[in-house]
Amino acid sequence: MLLTVFCCICGWSINAQETTRTAQGLKNIIQEQGLSQEVIFYSPDIVRVIAYPGQTRPEKKSYPVVLSPEEVKLDYTDNGDILSMKTSCMEVRVNKQTGKIAYYDLNGNLLLQEKEFGINFIPRQDGPNKSYRVSQRFLLDTDEIIYGLGQQQDGRMNQRGQELYLFNENTKVSIPYFTSEKGYGLYWDNPSPTTFSDTPMETSFNSETGLMSDYYFIYRNGTQDGVIGCIRKLTGASPMLPLWTMGFWQCRERYKSSDELCDVLDRYRELGIPLDGIVQDWQYWGCDSNWNAMKFMNPRYINAMGDEKWMRYLPNGEDPNANYPEPRIKSPKEMVDYVHKHNAHLMISIWPSFGPWTDQYKELKEINALLPVITWPRNSGAQPYDPFNPKAREIYWKYLRNLYDMDIDAWWTDATEPDHFDRKDKDFDFMTPDGTFRSVHNAYPLMSNKGIYEQQRALSDSKRLFLMTRSSYFGQQRFASFCWSGDVVSQWHVMRKQIAAGLNYTLCGIPYWNT
């Protein structure tokens, strides 16, 4: 009676166990849970496993994954309750009754197994949509060491024995992926806020919203090089960065005029200290209401001090009556050319949020592509844009062309989590074209960097791209994205923690990182 009631709630009935072989794996009905389960081989070393209530697979977009399933030679062995599928790299055994899956190497050594009946769906409302809280539980060896989960600030290398809330924010990059000393990797493909938990009883991912459980198991020859090679195949290759980006950089918070920036460059050259890159930080656009205008509108940069048309843009806190000397560098383009003439490169700060005076703000508001959240700078009226909206990404690039056309060399994509203060649950009900902000949250930096990379690449392939960003997600390496560890404080114990943070981050398959 209980089973009948549950199946009616799910909208379908189960009369008998059904396991069907497919071209890429199998489809299985788990009677006791009323779930459909699919095992899909993308390659001999990458297998995807999904499960969902009912018989019809929900539509789902994967932001990191770019690989389509390849034709894979599978050797099936049916031993009653257990169906085995073997490739040239691994063996996957499925319990047809319970749906439990176990992964083995070709010598029969157990790599990882799911927990029996370890998939849970709890109905919830996600904004206007019906959805579920989705969790999946696994069993690891007692003393097994795992790495990954992005860039955490706890100083730990081994990620066992803890609970982590995977939610992107300043200094914390959350990637629902771990890799084992046994030579496999596991990516949980859900960009909503997710809790990772590891106890002596189980290891689990529990996501705030989703229509299916969805993960990728990766195993190639038992090495981390093999796993990372598979990640690049699954999510995209990492482009070669410009050689100069591997050199010495100079940055401060912040240069307040073109002269100040160029004077610092001059001093490096006088001292004979090699310098490859120098950074123009925030407020070159002016005051907070004009935040991220992507134009030099600060009167100190455009030789317009005293001009009423431009003085309204003078940054908050700067004295409009101060006796500033006549600038030697009189325009932003002259500054960029000066940097290049002295054999250096210029990176400039750009943000996902826009102040209410900017043209971007007005255009994005017209298409409902501004997130209704409190962001940096506070009390300015600035709002982050919606990078899941293709039109919004086009608007973003249209204005970034102002800086691109000046021959600026690299982009500092700051605060790409994005900053979100005084968070309320209703903030996450905002509807993007792909669903609620809650359902896509952690993929925000991936999509924001994607928009810049792809729009610039469509314009020209003559110059290597370089994007330094404050946040990241699985697969972001394909957008020439270089993450740094955010606004950490300058203390020795904090610096020590960055070593583990960077190593765990790069073990997620993203090679470039700094602090």
Regions found by a protein language model. Give the residues of each.
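Extended Gly/Ser/Thr-rich low-complexity repeat segments
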Residues: E38-D45, P58-S68, R93-N107, E116
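Catalytic domains of carbohydrate-active enzymes, especially glycoside hydrolases
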Residues: D263-Q283
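Bacterial Sec-dependent N-terminal signal peptides
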Residues: M1-T19
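Aromatic- and carboxylate-enriched substrate-binding clefts and catalytic-loop regions
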Residues: G277-T515
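Glycine-centered tight beta-turn/hairpin loop motif at sheet-sheet or coil-to-beta transitions
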Residues: I30-G34, T87-C89
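A low-complexity, Ser/Thr/Gly/Pro-enriched, surface-exposed linker/loop concept
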Residues: Q17-G25, I40-S84, I122-R124
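Catalytic and substrate-binding clefts that recognize carbohydrates or anionic sugar/phosphate headgroups
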Residues: D78-T245, C251-R254, S258-E270, S471
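N-terminal small/glycine-rich loop or linker at the start of catalytic domains
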Residues: P239-C251, V373-P384
